[in-house]
Amino acid sequence: EQNPAPFLVILLFNDPVMTGYVFAAVLWLFDKDQHTLQAISVLPIPLHYYLFSKATILSVLSTLVALVIALAVRGTGYGWMDLLAGTFLSTFLFAGLGFAVGSKSRNFNEMLLYSIPLLILSGLPLLPMAGLGTALHFLPFPSTGGLGLLQQALGLPVALSRWGLYAHLLLFNALAWAWAFRLTQKQLL
């Protein structure tokens, strides 16, 4: 019988986490298209609160979807902390990337065009699951930490320590959000 864990990692990564990316990019494009950025620019709260609140909602929803998927596919035999934190932080990371790409894009088609290389590069850290390289080869990619936590949660071997995976994911969250803040702030000026 084949182990469903590798397929579950792919499903958990692609469905909830990538949904966070697409929704964040589309939310920003919608705000831009509906001319609500002017209203956002005069809010009494900083822009990052607005973005963090949207990303937090997307991340919570993504984590709940991942939990339902994991329970439906495999029951309760998981490393729950790694599964939930890996999904939440990965979605938060990709929401930041989504806001950045959405702010660079003039329309939905341009957003899709910018998304293709980003999504291809983000999927490359899945290659070690097919026996092509190790996670160490893919450290420069933002999705490596989150994928590693999902693999660890499902009992699959990983090349980095648990805390190394968390550190990787937090570092790339900081980088993605710094990029998102810089680009979205330009839209408000």
PLM regions and their residue ranges:
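Transmembrane helix segments
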Residues: S105-T144
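Short hydrophobic, aromatic-rich alpha-helical segments embedded in or entering the lipid bilayer
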Residues: A130-Y166
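Short amphipathic alpha-helical coupling elements at transmembrane boundaries
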Residues: Q38-V42, R106, G148-Q152
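Junction motif at the cytosolic side of a transmembrane helix
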Residues: A100, K104, H168-L189
